[in-house]
C-alpha cells in the first residue's frame, strides 16, 4: 500500500469528508484520500484526493496522478523506510471545538426540534454530539453506518417525502437530509416543504435578508437566478460570480468578506469554519439564522427569491465537447450579447441561456432563466433542440 512508498499514513477510519478536510487544513499532512461507495452505481468505489489545505486537487494534478498510476512509476523504498500508520483519536474533538467556536457564543435563542436523516452517513459519528451541545431535541433516521450498499439517486425522493411527513407529524422546527459524503444537504421546513438545490440557496438568502450583516458578499455560480443578486443587493450584500467547480468555489470563498459560497447543488461553504463544502456546519448555520429570524421557517420562506431557472442535461461524447461548444459560440451566440465565465452565456430578450460542459461526465448542461418557469422551460427546450442538432453534425 501507500506505506511501501515511504509515506506515513494517518488512518481516520470512518469519517465525514468535511472532518477530513478540516484535519488537513493546519496539521502538517501533505494530502488526503477518501474512499466512498459511488452513489450512482452499485459496487463501485469513489476515490477522492485532497491537497494539504483540504481542497480537491486540480484537474491537471489529477491527470498526473492517473499517469503515474497507469505507468506504475511510484516510488519504492527499502523495508527499513516503509511508512508508519498512525491513529489520531482527537480529530473529532478538534473539529467539534472549532465548529462550536465558529457558530459563536450561545448561537440560538430557542431549543430546536429537529428530524435528521443521516442516510447512513459517517456524519453520525460527530453531528449528534454537536447538536446535543447546542441544546437541540433531535429525532434521527437511518443513523447506522453498517449499510452495505450506497443510496441510489432514485431512492432519495422517497426518503425526502418520508422526512417531510415525520417533520409535520412531530411539529418539528425543521428536518435535514444529509448526503452520504457529508458535503450536501436538503432542508425540510416546519410546513413540510422540501428545499434543495437552488431552492435551498433561495431559502438561505431569505434568512440572510432577515438579519443582514453590515457588509459582505456571497459567491454564486454564473447560472444562479438574477433574483438572488437583487434580493441580496437590497440588504446591502454583494454578489460575486465564479466557476461552479469545487476548487473554484473554494478559492472564491477565501476572499475577504465572503459570507458563504455555493454552486446551488446543496453544497454550502461557510468561511467562518473553513473554505470547503460542509453540510454539518451548514446545518448549524441554518439554525443560527433561523434563531435570529424569530419566526417559523415557513414564514421566512414566503420571502425567498423566486427560482425561475430551468436546467437540462444532454449526453455528449467527450471528444465532441470542444467542437460543439465552438459551434454554440459561432452559430447560436454570434449575434447576441454573451459572456464566457463558464461555458457560453447568451442574453435573450427576457432572460438568458447558458451552455456549459460537465467537468467529469460526458454531458452538456443547458440552463435558462426567464420571468416564469414555463417561459424558461420553453427557452431551454429550444436551445436543447439546437444543441442536439449541432451534436448530430459534429
Predicted features, each with a name:
Residues 1-44, 129-188:
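N-terminal small/polar loop signature for handling phosphorylated ligands or for N-terminal nucleophile
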Residues 1-2, 43-52, 126-128, 180-201, ...:
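Short Gly/Thr/Asp-enriched flexible loops that form oxyanion-binding sites at enzyme active sites
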Residues 3, 21, 66, 100, ...:
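Predominant activation on well-ordered alpha-helical scaffold segments within soluble catalytic domains
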Residues 12, 19, 63-97, 101, ...:
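Proline/glycine-rich low-complexity loops and linkers
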Residues 24-27, 39-42, 105-109, 166-170, ...:
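Solvent-exposed alpha-helices and their adjacent loops that cap or buttress functional pockets
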Residues 43-170:
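Gly/Ser/Thr-enriched, mixed-charge loops and adjacent short helices
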Residues 173-174, 213-394:
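Phosphate-binding and adjacent anionic-ligand microenvironments
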Amino acid at each position: 500500500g501507500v506505506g511501501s512508498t515511504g509515506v506515513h499514513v494517518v488512518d481516520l477510519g470512518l469519517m465525514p469528508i468535511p472532518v477530513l478536510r478540516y484535519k488537513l487544513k493546519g496539521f502538517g499532512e501533505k494530502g488526503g484520500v477518501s474512499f466512498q461507495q459511488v452513489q450512482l452505481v452499485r459496487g463501485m468505489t469513489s476515490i477522492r484526493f485532497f491537497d494539504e489545505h483540504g481542497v480537491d486537487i486540480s484537474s491537471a494534478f489529477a491527470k498526473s496522478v492517473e499517469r503515474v498510476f497507469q505507468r506504475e512509476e511510484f516510488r519504492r523504498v527499502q523495508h527499513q523506510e516503509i511508512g508508519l500508520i498512525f491513529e489520531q483519536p482527537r480529530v473529532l474533538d478538534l473539529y467539534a471545538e472549532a465548529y462550536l467556536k465558529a457558530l459563536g457564543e450561545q448561537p440560538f435563542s430557542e431549543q430546536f426540534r429537529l428530524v435528521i436523516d443521516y442516510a447512513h452517513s459517517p456524519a453520525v459519528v460527530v453531528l449528534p454530539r454537536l447538536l446535543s451541545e447546542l441544546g437541540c431535541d433531535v429525532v434521527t433516521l437511518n443513523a447506522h453506518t453498517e449499510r452495505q450498499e450506497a443510496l441510489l439517486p432514485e431512492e432519495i425522493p422517497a426518503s425526502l417525502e418520508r422526512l417531510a411527513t415525520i417533520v409535520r407529524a412531530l411539529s418539528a422546527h425543521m428536518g435535514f437530509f444529509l448526503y452520504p459524503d457529508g458535503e450536501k444537504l436538503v432542508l425540510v421546513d416546519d410546513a413540510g416543504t422540501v428545499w434543495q438545490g437552488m431552492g435551498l440557496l433561495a431559502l438561505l438568502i431569505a434568512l440572510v435578508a432577515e438579519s443582514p450583516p453590515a457588509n459582505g458578499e456571497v459567491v454564486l455560480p454564473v447560472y444562479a437566478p438574477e433574483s438572488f443578486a437583487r434580493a441580496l443587493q437590497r440588504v446591502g450584500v454583494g454578489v460575486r460570480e465564479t466557476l461552479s467547480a469545487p476548487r473554484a468555489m473554494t478559492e472564491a470563498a477565501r476572499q475577504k468578506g465572503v459570507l458563504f459560497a455555493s454552486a446551488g447543488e446543496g453544497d454550502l461553504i461557510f468561511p467562518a469554519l473553513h473554505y470547503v463544502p460542509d453540510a454539518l456546519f451548514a446545518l448549524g448555520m441554518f439554525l443560527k439564522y433561523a434563531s435570529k429570524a424569530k419566526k417559523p421557517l415557513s414564514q421566512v420562506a414566503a420571502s425567498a427569491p423566486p427560482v425561475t431557472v430551468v436546467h437540462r442535461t444532454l449526453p455528449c461524447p467527450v471528444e465532441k465537447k470542444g467542437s460543439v461548444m465552438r459551434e454554440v459560440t459561432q452559430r447560436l451566440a454570434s449575434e447576441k450579447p454573451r459572456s464566457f465565465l463558464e461555458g457560453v452565456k447568451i442574453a435573450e430578450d427576457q432572460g438568458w441561456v447558458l451552455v456549459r460542459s460537465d467537468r467529469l461526465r460526458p454531458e452538456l448542461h443547458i440552463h435558462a432563466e426567464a420571468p416564469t418557469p414555463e417561459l424558461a422551460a420553453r427557452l431551454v427546450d429550444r436551445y436543447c433542440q439546437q444543441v442536439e442538432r449541432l451534436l448530430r453534425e459534429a
